[in-house]
Regions:
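Active-site helix/loop of acyl-thioester processing domains in fatty-acid/polyketide metabolism
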Residues: 52-77
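Hydrophobic beta-strand-centered segment that forms part of the acyl-chain substrate-binding groove
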Residues: 2-3, 68-104
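Short aromatic-glycine motifs in intrinsically disordered, low-complexity regions
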Residues: 6-16
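Hydrophobic residues on conserved beta-strands that form the core of alpha/beta folds
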Residues: 22-23, 88, 118, 132
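Conserved positions in beta-strands of structured domains
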Residues: 23-26, 94, 108-110
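Hydrophobic core residues within well-ordered beta-strands of beta-rich domains
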Residues: 19-21, 103, 117
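Catalytic strand-loop segment that frames the active site of acyl-thioester-processing enzymes
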Residues: 16-52
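HotDog/MaoC-like acyl-thioester-processing domains
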Residues: 34, 98-101, 108-147
Length: 147
């Protein structure tokens, strides 16, 4: 069993700083994946004292990608590949978080058809639900650089 929070996120994601919006994988099972991300004081998508919509969407997509990366590396023992956002549907943002807040995100697996995967994503700050979406991602054959 892997201690999820000890896994360097770079092992699971193709993105590299400053474009990484997941700090830790908190949990994985076949149905649910959880991640966390502390909003930085400054950086990409921090605008006017808030984490912008684009950042929330990218965080949700990267949380979904962390699930796929974990499965590849630790379940199937194959190289992690680059994926792409196919669509974001039913996006609802209830509040934009501020620097210093920690996002805790739950990715619920819905279905996979060939290399297309559908997930539902919920983003929380503490007990407060701040964003939801359904995200469709597509896999590729391009392997990420080993971290």
């Amino acid at each position: 069993m892997t201690a999820f929070d000890q896994i360097p996120i770079e092992y699971l994601l193709p993105q590299r700083p400053p474009f990484v919006f997941v700090d830790h994988l908190l949990h994985y099972d076949e149905a649910i994946t959880r991640t966390s991300f502390r909003i930085p004081e400054q950086g990409v998508f921090v605008e006017n004292g808030h984490f912008a919509t684009g950042g929330l969407v990218e965080h949700m997509a990267q949380s979904s990608a962390a699930r796929v990366g974990y499965i590849a590396r630790y379940v199937l023992h194959i190289p992690v590949t680059i994926g792409y956002i196919g669509s974001v549907r039913k996006l609802r943002i209830f509040r934009h978080p501020v620097p210093g807040e920690v996002l805790e995100t739950t990715v619920t697996f819905r279905e996979k058809i060939f290399e297309i995967e559908l997930t539902d994503v919920e983003v929380r700050c503490g007990d407060e639900l701040i964003a939801t979406a359904s995200i469709k991602t597509a896999g590729s054959d391009k392997v990420i650089d080993e971290a």
